[in-house]
Amino acid sequence: MKKVLFTLLVSVLAISACKDDSGEAPAPLDPLAVGEVAELNSSLAYNFSATYCGPCLNPGAQVSRDINTNLGENGYFIKMHPDGSYASIAVTEEATAFETNAWNLAVEAGTAQAGYRSWPSFGVNSELMRGSNFATYTDYITYSGEQASIYRNSPCKANIGSKFMLEGKKLTLKYKLQSFQGLEGRHRIAFYVVENDQNSQQWGLHEGGTDPESLPVIHSPLLIGSLTGTFGEEDINGLSAGEALEGTVEYDLKYMDYDKAPRMGGNYNDVNVEPVLDNLDVFAIIFDGNSSNYKFVNISKAERVTP
């Protein structure tokens, strides 16, 4: 009898603990709720290259991997295929706009040189570069890592914490933009969708040989679109130190259709958007929009939550 009474008592206490003072059970915790945002700078390195370019295996694929490796924990890398890059997969409007903006920033800074808009080229944060800027290959691939280390230890103006969930092709993301040093003037935030495991053949110079049907090359993380436009959709006009801004983004990935983007002909890289769902990441980027072009401020990776 004592055992039965004890069991009943524990059950009553457990039920009571699940109710508030009004006797109602509290609402379930939101799995997408964003907690404290890290006061931390991360860098963005990006590479404009192609798949239909014989000489582009090294600067296109291998360099991408080397740059990504050298970033370490201090930043993130995104491979982009802009219009005119002779890529046969994921030629996106976002990549084209990003390349144009990177070039315009170089012009604005007075560092633009002939050939910068000829792929492949790469950048780190708001700086655009080509291999001709460096004396050796090692200098070339380690530069972004060195810059990322410096930026990591700089004062953090603001950062974004975000979480997303996929139900079918419907993506729901919640975010918190936290200001630490203050964001003066106009800023924007954008959310980029990338595929983190894209294997596609590299025409002319594949890993494993020069035959077009040889082993594929890894093109990852590969930009396939944006949830909020290339540089965001809404202006954030000033955010004082200590202030935060929260929001929700919903997007149906059936509208992304990145595999239908303009591209070179051929059957080397036929892609179905379905497998992307399992290999999908989302990056949140803060941009400074106080000039006619968008300057990089910070980047973070959204946490994926299982429904």
What are these regions (language model features)?
Residues 11, 38-41, 46, 115, ...:
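A broadly tuned, weak detector of single residues within folded domains
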Residues 33-84:
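Local sequence-structure signature of Cys/Sec-based thiol-disulfide redox active-site neighborhoods
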Residues 79-307:
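Short, conserved sequence motifs used for protein processing/export or organelle targeting and
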Residues 15, 50-53, 255:
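Mature extracytoplasmic/luminal segments of secretory-pathway proteins
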Residues 15-18, 67, 203-208:
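General "foldedness" signal
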Residues 1-44, 307:
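Bacterial Sec-dependent N-terminal signal peptides
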